[in-house]
């Protein structure tokens, strides 16, 4: 008989594909949380080093990278995506705060480059992309979450098994918050096209 045959199942409406009573995971959009503690300031024009801030004893403390209002500052991080990643574009949302009652906006942008085994790490990033600048609420230390960015094309011809380096920065030419923006982390969205990483 035939081998390697696909099975196509199409849930109706808002129905969920299940095996017995358990939902079956379907390839598609996925999320990675990258906290500020997994990032590092760049040597040139870097943001401030990782800081910990207590707001009230016994309540959530902040681990943040602080970005000035006066000039563009940068940080980096890296991700080895799962094999099921489709090697396509990615998007992100930034999570941040500021110790100010200012209602100004903050603009975050991200660029990436994929490096293969035996490839040169000393390689330029692709074009930086970011969401619309996000305004603060006017209450000090409120959480601010940006909209999802546009598609970020990763330089370096991404392929399975590569490491992707990312460069994130505050674009002060596109914002007007007159205080440090405290980056807490980002949600990084990517797309899978396989059921697992086998």
Q: Where are these predicted regions, by residue range?
A:
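Short beta-strands within extracellular/lumenal beta-sheet-rich domains
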Residues: 68-84, 89
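Beta-strand-rich, repetitive solenoid scaffolds
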Residues: 1-2, 6-12, 16-21, 25-28, ...
């Amino acid at each position: 008989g035939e081998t390697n045959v696909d099975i196509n199942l199409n849930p109706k409406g808002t129905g969920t594909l299940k095996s017995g009573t358990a939902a079956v995971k379907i390839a598609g959009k996925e999320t990675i949380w990258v906290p500020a503690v997994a990032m590092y300031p760049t040597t040139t024009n870097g943001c401030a080093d990782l800081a910990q801030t207590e707001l009230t004893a016994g309540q959530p403390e902040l681990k943040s990278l602080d970005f000035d209002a006066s000039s563009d500052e940068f940080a980096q991080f890296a991700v080895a995506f799962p094999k099921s990643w489709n090697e396509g574009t990615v998007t992100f949302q930034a999570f941040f705060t500021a110790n100010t009652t200012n209602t100004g906006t903050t603009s975050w942008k991200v660029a990436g480059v994929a490096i293969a085994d035996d490839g040169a790490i000393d390689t330029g990033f692709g074009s930086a992309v970011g969401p619309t600048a996000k305004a603060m609420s006017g209450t000090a230390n409120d959480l601010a979450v940006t909209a999802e960015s546009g598609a970020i094309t990763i330089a370096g011809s991404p392929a399975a098994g590569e490491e992707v380096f990312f460069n994130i920065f505050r674009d002060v030419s596109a914002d007007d918050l007159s205080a440090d923006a405290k980056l807490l982390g980002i949600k990084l969205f990517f797309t899978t096209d396989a059921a697992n990483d086998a």
